[in-house]
Amino acid sequence: MVFEGHLVGTGLKVGVVVGRFNEFITSKLLGGALDGLKRHGVEENDIDVAWVPGAFEIPLIAKKMANSGKYDAVITLGTVIRGATTHYDYVCNEVAKGVASLSLQTDIPVIFGVLTTETIEQAIERAGTKAGNKGYESAVAAIEMAHLSKQWA
């Protein structure tokens, strides 16, 4: 037997957590995610968005959303751009670990849509220009995973 999630979002409730740091990028990711959800049938009133200060704060609010029982999936969006210090490495590692563990802890798909880039240009490319919009891609993944995970509910 083959299990797959379908890409029809009708009836799904989705939470989105967005880091405000680098908002000129994260707002584009959010726009892409909202577009992706709506294009696939998720109603606007079935989408909740929570803004947090930065990427490091994303896992806590994503966990609270996932544990609330209100959502079929949670999308995390943020942008971490390498600077001159090791701060980038710590933030990227902790956010990735934190978000990755949430699906396993909560049984709710939590999608990692956090950009971790070397340059501002790379982030811009992934927020709706050359390399597509990772927010949109995260929305599609959330819909697919929500349906796929329900097959074992």
Swiss-Prot record:
Tell me which InterPro entries the record gives.
LS, LS/RS, LS/RS_sf
Residues at the active site:
H87 (proton donor)
Any GO BP annotation: riboflavin biosynthetic process
Q: Which SUPFAM superfamilies match?
A: Lumazine synthase (SSF52121)
Key words, A-Z? Riboflavin biosynthesis, Transferase
- List the Gene Ontology MF annotations in alphabetical order: 6,7-dimethyl-8-ribityllumazine synthase activity
- The UniProt annotation places 5-amino-6-(D-ribitylamino)uracil binding at F21, A55, F56, E57, T79, V80, I81, F112
A cellular-component GO term for this protein: cytosol
Source taxon at top rank: Bacteria
User: Which residues does (2S)-2-hydroxy-3-oxobutyl phosphate bind?
Assistant: A84, T85, R126
Q: Which reaction does it catalyse?
A: (2S)-2-hydroxy-3-oxobutyl phosphate + 5-amino-6-(D-ribitylamino)uracil = 6,7-dimethyl-8-(1-D-ribityl)lumazine + phosphate + 2 H2O + H(+)
Pathway field of the UniProt record reads: Cofactor biosynthesis; riboflavin biosynthesis; riboflavin from 2-hydroxy-3-oxobutyl phosphate and 5-amino-6-(D-ribitylamino)uracil: step 1/2
Q: What is its EC number?
A: 2.5.1.78
Assembly and oligomerization: Forms an icosahedral capsid composed of 60 subunits, arranged as a dodecamer of pentamers.
- What role is this protein assigned? Catalyzes the formation of 6,7-dimethyl-8-ribityllumazine by condensation of 5-amino-6-(D-ribitylamino)uracil with 3,4-dihydroxy-2-butanone 4-phosphate. This is the penultimate step in the biosynthesis of riboflavin.
The text of the family note is: Belongs to the DMRL synthase family.
Q: Indicate what this protein is called per its UniProt record.
A: 6,7-dimethyl-8-ribityllumazine synthase
Gene that encodes it = ribH
